[in-house]
């Protein structure tokens, strides 16, 4: 009875976060695309945020549909064809969501951090190429991830066909999701490490800047300091949710033997990550925040008009 109540709670959170995530990411993409059409130009940061929002909508839908399918029919998730489709779909969705967020962290670092190092200055002058090359390199990791996963699925499928005693409850089968999680964790740790490095370098840059400012304007906050703090807020938010995401992977890995009880919990974490972080992006971006306030004001006025029409 307690297990059913917990599952209902996770399912309710998933549905709420799924709706919030689609609204938030759809709003981000719509605002930036409309602004792009009006001005006939778009900044690199807005391009990254728009691509991030679209990739997260894809991630939300793929995670939601995979969770829904496996919950309605627990046996279908062990069918080889379903495993291949669901894993490849989720890998692609998660890959672009994570790497676009990582590119955003790199962008903040190159635009705001202040170092006199030649390599840093070279990368800053060519920050557009840095982002493009980062995405191209990430495609290599994506290809390797998919190939490794499909090879593992083929090996598992061949073993299941040769072994007549192989079943969904067997030890060989319960080892399969653990290896899947291990592969996904290995590849998702790469962009996390890059974002963490950008965060640490931003902190070091801010510390050096504050130390320099002590000689000129002790106790005051200049625009550079404010820019550092704003960038750190954005990167910290991403790393915080990413850390929770990794913890959920670890929990799922060590408790994969009782996978039925953890699927909804894991799906909740995966869906919450792109939903809440996108809401933070809206609040921290002046253009998106202003557009969201205008939409809320319009909805408030509409609701007042409806109330006045109702006798």
Swiss-Prot record:
GO (cellular component) term, any one: membrane
Coarse class of the protein's main subcellular location: membrane
CDD domains according to UniProt: 7tm_TAS2R14-like
One Pfam match: TAS2R
Keywords assigned by UniProt, alphabetized: G-protein coupled receptor, Glycoprotein, Membrane, Receptor, Sensory transduction, Taste, Transducer, Transmembrane, Transmembrane helix
Subcellular location: Membrane
Cytoplasmic face residues: 33-47, 111-129, 208-230, 284-311
Keyword Membrane included in the entry's annotation: yes
Transmembrane segments: 10-32, 48-68, 90-110, 130-150, 187-207, 231-251, 263-283
Source domain of life: Eukaryota
Glycosylation site residues: 87, 163, 172
GO molecular function terms noted in the UniProt entry: bitter taste receptor activity; G protein-coupled receptor activity
Record topology, Extracellular segments: 1-9, 69-89, 151-186, 252-262
Membrane topology: Multi-pass membrane protein
Keyword Transmembrane helix recorded: yes
Remaining remarks: Several bitter taste receptors are expressed in a single taste receptor cell.
Function noted in UniProt: Putative taste receptor which may play a role in the perception of bitterness.
Protein family: Belongs to the G-protein coupled receptor T2R family.
Protein name (Swiss-Prot/TrEMBL): Taste receptor type 2 member 125
Species whose genome carries this gene: Mus musculus
Record lineage: Eukaryota, Metazoa, Chordata, Craniata, Vertebrata
């Amino acid at each position: 009875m307690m297990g059913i109540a917990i599952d209902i709670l996770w399912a309710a959170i998933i549905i709420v976060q799924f709706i919030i995530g689609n609204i938030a990411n759809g709003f981000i993409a719509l605002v930036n695309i409309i602004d792009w059409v009006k001005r006939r130009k778009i900044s690199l940061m807005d391009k990254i945020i728009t691509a991030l929002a679209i990739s997260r909508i894809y991630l939300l839908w793929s995670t939601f549909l995979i969770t829904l399918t496996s919950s309605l029919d627990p046996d279908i998730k062990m069918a080889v064809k379903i495993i291949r489709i669901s894993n490849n779909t989720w890998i692609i969705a998660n890959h672009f969501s994570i790497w676009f967020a990582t590119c955003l962290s790199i962008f903040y670092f190159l635009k705001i951090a202040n170092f006199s190092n030649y390599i840093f200055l070279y990368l800053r002058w060519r920050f557009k190429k840095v982002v493009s090359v980062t995405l191209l390199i990430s495609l290599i990791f994506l290809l390797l991830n998919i190939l490794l996963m499909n090879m593992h699925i083929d090996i598992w499928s061949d073993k299941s066909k040769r072994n007549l005693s192989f079943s969904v409850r067997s030890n060989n089968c319960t080892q399969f999701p653990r290896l899947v999680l291990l592969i996904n964790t290995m590849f998702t740790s790469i962009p996390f490490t890059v974002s963490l490095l950008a965060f640490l370098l931003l902190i070091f840059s801010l510390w050096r800047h504050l130390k320099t400012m002590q000689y000129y304007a002790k106790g005051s906050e200049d625009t550079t300091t404010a820019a550092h703090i704003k960038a750190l807020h954005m990167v910290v938010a991403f790393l915080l949710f990413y850390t929770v995401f990794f913890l959920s992977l670890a929990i799922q890995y060590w408790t994969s033997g009782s996978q039925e009880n953890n699927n909804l919990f894991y799906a909740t974490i995966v869906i919450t990550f792109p939903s809440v972080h996108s809401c933070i992006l809206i609040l921290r971006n002046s253009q998106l925040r202003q557009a969201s306030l205008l939409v809320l004001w319009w909805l408030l006025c509409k609701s007042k008009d409806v109330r006045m029409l109702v006798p």
